[in-house]
């Protein structure tokens, strides 16, 4: 049985196939070996934030903005023995392109162990993209699962000057001991290392604490990564009813920033399901989702790249205008408008 499982999880193709959308203002590309967003850049400033990838030779491996599903983090010991991979199967299997027309595309993947299917629809509009993912439980039984977006930025976009901002609020360090890791509680952008405050907006040569999770109290969550010298902002917007958690991962190599995860999802506790189900909630937010037999659940987010008119030290707020736009305001008072692709949500 285990041999069969390993065959099912093996890459179906050795050469990566990429699905690319290009509207003349921006281009965005998805690697069908694993389904990750691996390239997003403006035509007049060709800098791709999504250069990070895990080491290895497998065609389907973690890279760029990948999806974690049916879990975030490690399986249980029994699941590991059954062949369940870290962060779930969805970024370890081949995706199949369903269609592509102009600036829209559809792709799909099946998770043979989890018995889940996912269909992703991407619509590129200006320098933003709307991504909708519909998850279907193919089993005759309901089950708990998790779905965490794992955008991971890397050099050369990522360096010591990049600033991360968000409307996240209460949080906790994943390194805090169970069963109550939410104590001590911190508030974005603060974290604690050995009892001393750490500002997670910046990353220089010390990644600790390397994973800190926060909840968002507003109707919509947002997170941005701003490069001051390049005047370039990468950002995400999502509905917190769908993704209540923001998880910040930081990684350094050779004393330099190497990866920053801007991870939003259905859970904020990096533990196997036996622990998640016992814990249940933190800060009143659930640590897992439930999908019934044959049910389909959809979630969506907006990703954008914008160039600022002048250098800035960070994004102070992102607000919805009600007239089809988001307004990004810098700490210096600059305003940049982004089309609201989540309108009506």
Where are these regions (language model features)?
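Positively charged n-region of N-terminal signal peptides that target proteins for export
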Residues: 1-4
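Intrinsically disordered and other compositionally biased segments
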Residues: 8-9, 137
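Hydrophobic h-region of N-terminal signal peptides that target proteins for export
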Residues: 9-16
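Surface-exposed acidic/polar loop and edge beta-strand patches at domain peripheries
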Residues: 17-130, 138-345
């Amino acid at each position: 049985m285990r041999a069969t499982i390993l065959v099912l999880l093996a890459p179906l193709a050795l050469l990566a196939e990429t699905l690319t959308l290009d509207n003349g203002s921006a281009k965005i590309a998805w690697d069908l070996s694993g389904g990750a967003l691996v390239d997003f850049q403006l035509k007049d400033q060709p800098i791709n934030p999504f250069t990070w990838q895990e080491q290895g030779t497998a065609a389907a491996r973690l890279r760029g903005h990948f999806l974690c599903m049916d879990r975030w983090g490690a399986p249980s010991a029994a699941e590991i023995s059954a062949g369940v991979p870290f962060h779930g199967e969805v970024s370890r299997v081949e995706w199949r392109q369903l269609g592509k027309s102009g600036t829209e595309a559809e792709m799909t993947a099946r998770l043979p162990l989890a018995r889940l299917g996912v269909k992703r629809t991407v619509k590129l509009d200006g320098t933003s993209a709307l991504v909708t993912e519909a998850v279907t439980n193919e089993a005759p039984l309901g089950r708990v699962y998790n779905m965490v977006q794992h955008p991971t930025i890397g050099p050369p976009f990522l360096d010591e000057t990049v600033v991360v901002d968000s409307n996240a609020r209460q949080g906790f360090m994943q390194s805090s001991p169970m069963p109550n890791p939410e104590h001590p509680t911190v508030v974005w952008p603060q974290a604690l290392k050995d009892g001393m405050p750490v500002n997670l907006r910046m990353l220089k040569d010390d990644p600790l604490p390397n994973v800190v999770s926060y909840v968002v109290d507003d109707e919509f969550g947002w997170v941005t990564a701003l490069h001051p010298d390049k005047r370039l902002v990468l950002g995400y917007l999502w509905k917190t009813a769908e993704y209540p958690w923001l998880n910040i991962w930081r990684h350094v190599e050779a004393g330099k920033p190497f990866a920053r995860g801007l991870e939003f999802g259905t859970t904020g506790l990096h533990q196997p399901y036996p622990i998640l189900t016992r814990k249940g909630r933190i800060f009143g937010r659930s640590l897992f989702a439930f999908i019934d037999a044959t049910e389909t659940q959809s979630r969506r987010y907006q990703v954008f790249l914008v160039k600022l008119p002048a250098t800035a030290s960070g994004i102070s707020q992102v607000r919805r205008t009600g007239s089809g736009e988001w307004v990004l305001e810098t700490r210096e008072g600059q305003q940049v408008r982004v089309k609201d692709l989540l309108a009506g949500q």
